[in-house]
Amino acid sequence: MPFHLAPYLAKSVPGVGVLGALVGGAAALAKNVRLLKEKRITNTEAAIDTGKETVGAGLATALSAVAATAVGGGLVVSLGTALVAGVAAKYAWDRGVDLVEKELNRGKAANGASDEDILRDELA
């Protein structure tokens, strides 16, 4: 008896998120393989970017499924809701990751800046 992955994952929000992560991760990996071949990024950079994109795509997909289900409506309303929620979730994820990376690169302890100072600088 064959196992049907997509219908199995579509039964729950976490499953939908996993499916989104698989698709988003595959797209990120394809992009990073090309960049690796062109020697524009290192293996470490490719792995980190692929991981970030995989998680972000999974979260965005899961949130878009929740939003579309909560709003209901017809096909157009559901698709529009899913699109807006997915874009918003991915944007928030990317922005959060950028803030964390900047803080790590800056070396918060080395410059003695408080969390409030760092946040104020990033939001300015």
From Swiss-Prot:
Keywords: Biomineralization, Iron, Magnetosome, Membrane, Metal-binding, Transmembrane, Transmembrane helix. One of its GO terms (molecular function) is metal ion binding. Changing residue 49 to A: MIC expressed as a fragment or fused to MBP no longer improves iron particles, binds magnetite. It is found in: Magnetosome membrane. Foreign proteins fused to the N-terminal membrane-targeted domain of this protein are expressed on the magnetosome membrane, subsequent purification of the fusion protein occurs by extracting the organelles from the lysed bacteria using magnets. In this study human thyroid-stimulating hormone receptor (TSHR) and class II major histocompatibility complex (MHC II) were expressed and purified; expression is better when the endogenous gene is deleted. Its main location: membrane. The chain crosses the membrane at residues 9-29, 65-85. Probably involved in magnetite crystal growth. The lumenal domain may bind the magnetite crystals, affecting crystal size and shape. This is Magnetosome protein MamC. It comes from Paramagnetospirillum magneticum (strain ATCC 700264 / AMB-1). The gene is mamC.
